[in-house]
Protein backbone atom coordinates (compact mmCIF):
# COMPACT_ATOMS: atom_id res chain seq x y z
CA UNK A 1 0.00 0.00 0.00
CA UNK A 2 1.46 3.40 -0.93
CA UNK A 3 1.32 6.56 1.16
CA UNK A 4 -1.66 7.99 -0.75
CA UNK A 5 -3.65 4.79 -0.23
CA UNK A 6 -2.73 4.75 3.45
CA UNK A 7 -3.80 8.39 3.85
CA UNK A 8 -7.11 7.62 2.12
CA UNK A 9 -7.75 4.63 4.41
CA UNK A 10 -6.91 6.70 7.49
CA UNK A 11 -9.05 9.64 6.31
CA UNK A 12 -12.00 7.33 5.64
CA UNK A 13 -11.74 5.85 9.14
CA UNK A 14 -11.44 9.28 10.81
CA UNK A 15 -14.47 10.59 8.90
CA UNK A 16 -16.63 7.71 10.17
CA UNK A 17 -15.78 8.21 13.86
CA UNK A 18 -16.79 11.06 16.16
CA UNK A 19 -15.11 10.65 19.57
CA UNK A 20 -11.41 11.04 20.31
CA UNK A 21 -9.24 10.83 23.37
CA UNK A 22 -7.02 13.88 23.70
CA UNK A 23 -3.96 13.93 25.96
CA UNK A 24 -2.37 17.29 26.80
CA UNK A 25 0.55 18.18 29.05
CA UNK A 26 2.95 20.95 29.98
CA UNK A 27 5.96 19.00 31.25
CA UNK A 28 4.72 18.97 34.85
CA UNK A 29 1.04 18.10 34.48
CA UNK A 30 -0.84 15.83 32.07
CA UNK A 31 -4.52 15.21 31.42
CA UNK A 32 -6.74 13.24 29.03
CA UNK A 33 -10.25 14.03 27.88
CA UNK A 34 -12.77 12.49 25.51
CA UNK A 35 -14.18 14.96 22.96
CA UNK A 36 -16.54 14.87 20.01
CA UNK A 37 -14.81 15.88 16.79
CA UNK A 38 -15.31 16.55 13.10
CA UNK A 39 -12.60 15.53 10.65
CA UNK A 40 -11.39 17.88 7.90
CA UNK A 41 -9.72 15.66 5.28
CA UNK A 42 -8.40 18.59 3.25
CA UNK A 43 -6.28 19.80 6.15
CA UNK A 44 -5.85 16.40 7.86
CA UNK A 45 -7.21 18.07 10.98
CA UNK A 46 -9.69 17.36 13.75
CA UNK A 47 -12.04 20.09 15.01
CA UNK A 48 -13.43 20.00 18.53
CA UNK A 49 -15.07 22.33 21.02
CA UNK A 50 -13.81 22.73 24.56
CA UNK A 51 -13.55 25.56 27.06
CA UNK A 52 -10.21 27.14 27.89
CA UNK A 53 -10.88 26.70 31.62
CA UNK A 54 -11.00 22.89 31.40
CA UNK A 55 -7.86 21.12 32.55
CA UNK A 56 -7.01 19.94 29.04
CA UNK A 57 -7.88 23.37 27.59
CA UNK A 58 -5.51 25.10 30.01
CA UNK A 59 -2.77 22.61 29.16
CA UNK A 60 -3.26 23.09 25.39
CA UNK A 61 -2.85 26.85 25.88
CA UNK A 62 0.47 26.17 27.64
CA UNK A 63 1.72 23.51 25.20
CA UNK A 64 0.11 23.02 21.79
CA UNK A 65 1.60 19.55 21.25
CA UNK A 66 -1.00 16.87 21.99
CA UNK A 67 -1.43 13.16 21.42
CA UNK A 68 -4.42 10.86 21.50
CA UNK A 69 -6.37 7.92 20.20
CA UNK A 70 -9.54 7.22 18.25
CA UNK A 71 -10.83 3.70 18.71
CA UNK A 72 -14.31 2.19 18.44
CA UNK A 73 -15.16 -0.88 20.51
CA UNK A 74 -15.07 -3.96 18.24
CA UNK A 75 -16.67 -7.25 19.22
CA UNK A 76 -13.65 -9.36 18.21
CA UNK A 77 -9.88 -8.94 17.83
CA UNK A 78 -10.22 -9.48 14.07
CA UNK A 79 -12.27 -6.26 13.83
CA UNK A 80 -9.89 -3.99 15.79
CA UNK A 81 -9.36 -0.65 14.07
CA UNK A 82 -7.98 2.43 15.71
CA UNK A 83 -5.68 5.41 15.47
CA UNK A 84 -2.90 6.88 17.56
CA UNK A 85 -2.10 10.47 16.66
CA UNK A 86 0.24 13.37 17.37
CA UNK A 87 -1.05 16.88 16.63
CA UNK A 88 -0.65 20.62 17.13
CA UNK A 89 -3.63 22.23 18.87
CA UNK A 90 -4.70 25.79 18.11
CA UNK A 91 -7.81 27.72 19.09
CA UNK A 92 -9.42 28.98 15.88
CA UNK A 93 -10.63 32.52 15.18
CA UNK A 94 -12.11 34.50 12.31
CA UNK A 95 -13.21 32.76 9.13
CA UNK A 96 -11.49 29.50 10.11
CA UNK A 97 -13.47 29.41 13.35
CA UNK A 98 -16.78 30.18 11.61
CA UNK A 99 -16.25 27.42 9.03
CA UNK A 100 -15.21 24.85 11.64
CA UNK A 101 -18.08 25.79 14.00
CA UNK A 102 -20.63 25.50 11.17
CA UNK A 103 -19.37 22.02 10.23
CA UNK A 104 -19.22 20.98 13.90
CA UNK A 105 -22.77 22.19 14.60
CA UNK A 106 -24.04 20.45 11.46
CA UNK A 107 -22.67 17.14 12.76
CA UNK A 108 -23.64 17.82 16.40
CA UNK A 109 -26.71 20.14 16.38
CA UNK A 110 -26.76 20.42 20.18
CA UNK A 111 -23.47 22.35 19.90
CA UNK A 112 -25.37 25.34 18.44
CA UNK A 113 -26.18 26.44 22.00
CA UNK A 114 -22.57 26.12 23.17
CA UNK A 115 -20.22 29.10 23.23
CA UNK A 116 -17.03 27.07 23.75
CA UNK A 117 -14.07 27.87 21.49
CA UNK A 118 -13.37 25.68 18.46
CA UNK A 119 -9.93 24.08 18.39
CA UNK A 120 -8.09 22.56 15.46
CA UNK A 121 -5.83 19.59 15.99
CA UNK A 122 -3.54 19.64 12.95
CA UNK A 123 -2.44 16.04 12.65
CA UNK A 124 1.33 15.66 12.43
CA UNK A 125 1.56 11.87 12.59
CA UNK A 126 -0.98 9.05 12.52
CA UNK A 127 -0.54 5.32 13.05
CA UNK A 128 -3.60 3.21 12.36
CA UNK A 129 -4.05 -0.40 13.31
CA UNK A 130 -6.54 -2.17 11.06
CA UNK A 131 -6.98 -5.87 11.69
CA UNK A 132 -9.71 -6.01 9.02
CA UNK A 133 -6.85 -5.77 6.48
CA UNK A 134 -4.97 -8.62 8.18
CA UNK A 135 -4.00 -9.15 11.80
CA UNK A 136 -1.56 -6.49 12.99
CA UNK A 137 -1.75 -4.35 9.83
CA UNK A 138 -0.42 -0.84 10.45
CA UNK A 139 -0.97 2.21 8.26
CA UNK A 140 1.14 5.34 8.69
CA UNK A 141 0.81 8.97 7.71
CA UNK A 142 3.17 11.86 8.54
CA UNK A 143 2.75 15.53 7.63
CA UNK A 144 5.56 16.67 5.34
Curated annotation (Swiss-Prot):
InterPro entries: Split_barrel_FMN-bd (IPR012349), UPF0306 (IPR011194)
Family named by the database record: Belongs to the UPF0306 family.
Protein name per its UniProtKB record: UPF0306 protein Spro_0510
Organism annotation: Serratia proteamaculans (strain 568)
